[in-house]
């Protein structure tokens, strides 16, 4: 038996049709309809989309003015994209860059590139560098330069200014003060321990004395007074001011130094004897005697000779010999001024005789 409401040939049942229409009328028009039952075909997308369009149109026509129209998610997304595109067109491009153009510049942004070249650090010029060096650093610089370039020794010796006597003596006094300053306080000044402490400074002092004495000897130094003044100061420092150490090595060194000093005195005083011109002997003796008297050399040499155990006796003898020769020359000159008969030479009027006969008045007519 067949159930009630079933019909062959696909004729719809009236009851089902009415129920379906009732459901269609009672459903909300705002909700999209994708199908009535699970038995409806889902394979045809075109029929479902067309039914969706018809349903939407029928729903929009049947709605009242108080009802709102619902949109599908796809349409809403498209409209949102359209609004965003429209808003993007109206907005200015690159808001960050455009806003920076209206910002007031700060102190760093006001910097303008200068047309002058960039200032960079530079080393000091050579003359400024030399000016900034002290004495010790300048000496070291010159010595290192000579060691690196030995060929500069002759050039520097030629162009270097000659030291004055006072400059030379100041340097010697500085070397001598180094000896005195290194003497021990709680020990005998003349002991061996004291000598060993000052030995390096003593050697430096004697070396400096030797170098400067050679610089003030003839023929390099032609001024006798300058040479004798320097020798006097050096002799005074070595004989009278330097402690007399009991060390045997020091005694031998001091004795040798005094012998050399005495020889230097003789070399300076006798420099005029080597000229070889006998005509100028009297004049040369007069120059030496004048220097001896002005500098009071005999008195000074006597003091040096007493302390040095007659080391300067030969210098004293030479000075006395020059004084005697000068006295003889003066006496011989006075004797030569007197003639052999003891008569005084005739006056100038007696030596001149003129014949006035040619200039007499009688001879004027013949002229």
UniProtKB/Swiss-Prot annotation:
Ranges of compositional bias, category Polar residues: 63-75
Keyword Nuclease included in the entry's annotation: no
Record region (Disordered): 1-93
Lineage: Eukaryota, Fungi, Dikarya, Ascomycota, Saccharomycotina
GO biological process: nuclear protein quality control by the ubiquitin-proteasome system; proteasome localization; protein transport
GO molecular function term, any single one: proteasome binding
GO CC terms of this entry: cytoplasm; nuclear membrane
Record protein name field: Tethering factor for nuclear proteasome STS1
Protein species of origin: Candida tropicalis (strain ATCC MYA-3404 / T1) (Yeast)
